[in-house]
Amino acid sequence: MTDSTAIALLSGGLDSATAAALAIKSGFRVIGLSFDYGQRHRRELDAAVEIAKALNLAEHHTINVDLAMWGGSSLTDHAQTLPTSGVETSIIPNTYVPGRNTVFIAIGLSLAEARGADRLVLGVNAVDYSGYPDCRPDYLEAFQDLADLSSRAGREGHGPKLWAPLVEWSKQQIAEEALHLGIPIERTWSCYSGGDVPCGVCDSCRIRDEALLAAGRPDLCSPGRP
């Protein structure tokens, strides 16, 4: 156990909620950090607030970073179509938001250093890094090197460390751990479509629903699931 502080990037989804809960389980005082970046699925921000309250986080902050200003992703540009045919492992999907995680992690590290936090907790996992370049282990290792070189705390040898506890986990493993930890999964939000009810057909809904079915909880699946 530890009395140290951790900053958890909290999207409002299942993965980040589970990572934050694992940080709490490890004894960290957790501060949640969410981002309004112009995403079409802004409902996830409401979910992040609900999860922060459910987990009794020490603090929760939402930062405005308008990445929709220049688009480049189906998550920030409504002219682009969301993928619904299954996750592509050979190409980077159009749900990739240019530079998003680089921006988020940089801001998270700024808050971590300002607050003297020991960890920056990320919910990236094996499903993410199969498609997204900024969720892969080599990216996280490189960013850690950058953080150690670019911050006063890092240069002094006590800078915050990136912690991605789910990085090797499947979505089913994450769902099972979330259930074990008592996370209110029904309050999390994964759907990319931007409505008030999960669509059940976007890739994010599909992956989540498959994991929940495998974990034995069909009652938590999207209402719109085919």
Curated annotation (Swiss-Prot):
Instruction: State where Zn(2+) binds.
Output: C191, C199, C202, C205
The cofactor binding remark recorded in the entry reads: Binds 1 zinc ion per subunit.
For this protein, the record's InterPro entries field holds: QueC, Rossmann-like_a/b/a_fold
The pathway it acts in is: Purine metabolism; 7-cyano-7-deazaguanine biosynthesis
Q: Which family does it belong to?
A: Belongs to the QueC family.
Function according to Swiss-Prot or TrEMBL: Catalyzes the ATP-dependent conversion of 7-carboxy-7-deazaguanine (CDG) to 7-cyano-7-deazaguanine (preQ(0)).
Q: Can you say what this protein is called?
A: 7-cyano-7-deazaguanine synthase
The organism is: Synechococcus sp. (strain CC9311)
From the broadest rank down, the organism's phylogenetic lineage runs: Bacteria, Bacillati, Cyanobacteriota, Cyanophyceae, Synechococcales
Gene name on record? queC
